[in-house]
């Protein structure tokens, strides 16, 4: 039987993970490549994100450029963008639904079984959102590894994992765990716990008839 403390813990974890997914989607450090050119002074660090690519000079100045065409992007990057956006939208809906079903709120009425079902629905939506983000981060991570070990890829254009991927993985894990805790609000378990078997009392001897 889920209590309000467990629901609050799950909701907090899921919300924290959702904020991490927002940060991961926004920052451009999904892929990073640091290398020095012929001149040490012109050393550059290149980053690729979901929406833009950036170049950081050795002086610390960063210049970013949005992608010109969506159709020109690799398939893995397009799929990752779509999955991350879907994950963020589902996470927002899950927070709204879970808030109505939590025991510590007055939304959703006073019916405990109904609120438990609402909280469980919010937890399931959180799990779907976490899975979408996990697939997105793992997909582009697999693509980075494949390109890195491809002998046909020049050394100066090979990329490694950026911090955004690790933030995305951590956020996905928190959303999944938080959704799992909220999903423990199963109405069936509460109804069983609330059931009390009627007591049976022995018949009194005074009710016997004597002949």
Swiss-Prot record:
Membrane topology, record value: Multi-pass membrane protein
Expression sites by tissue: Expressed predominantly in lung and kidney.
GO molecular function: identical protein binding; structural molecule activity
GO biological-process terms attached to the record: calcium-independent cell-cell adhesion via plasma membrane cell-adhesion molecules
Record localization: Cell membrane; Basolateral cell membrane; Cell junction, Tight junction
Superkingdom field: Eukaryota
TM spans (from-to): 8-28, 82-102, 120-140, 161-181
Keyword Cell membrane on entry: yes
Name of the protein this chain belongs to: Claudin-7
PANTHER family for this protein: CLAUDIN
Region Interactions with TJP1, TJP2 and TJP3, residue ranges: 210-211
PROSITE patterns noted in UniProt: CLAUDIN
Residue intervals annotated with topology Cytoplasmic: 1-7, 103-119, 182-211
Purpose of the protein: Plays a major role in tight junction-specific obliteration of the intercellular space, through calcium-independent cell-adhesion activity.
Pfam families: PMP22_Claudin
Membrane keyword on record: yes
Primary residence: membrane
Keywords carried by this UniProt record: Cell junction, Cell membrane, Membrane, Phosphoprotein, Tight junction, Transmembrane, Transmembrane helix
Source taxonomy: Eukaryota, Metazoa, Chordata, Craniata, Vertebrata
Subunit annotation: Directly interacts with TJP1/ZO-1, TJP2/ZO-2 and TJP3/ZO-3. The phosphorylated form interacts with EPCAM.
Family: Belongs to the claudin family.
PTM comment, free text: Phosphorylated.
InterPro entries associated with the record: Claudin, Claudin7, Claudin_CS, PMP22/EMP/MP20/Claudin
GO CC annotation terms, alphabetical: apicolateral plasma membrane; basolateral plasma membrane; bicellular tight junction; lateral plasma membrane; membrane; plasma membrane
UniProt topological domain (Extracellular) ranges: 29-81, 141-160
Organism: Mus musculus (Mouse)
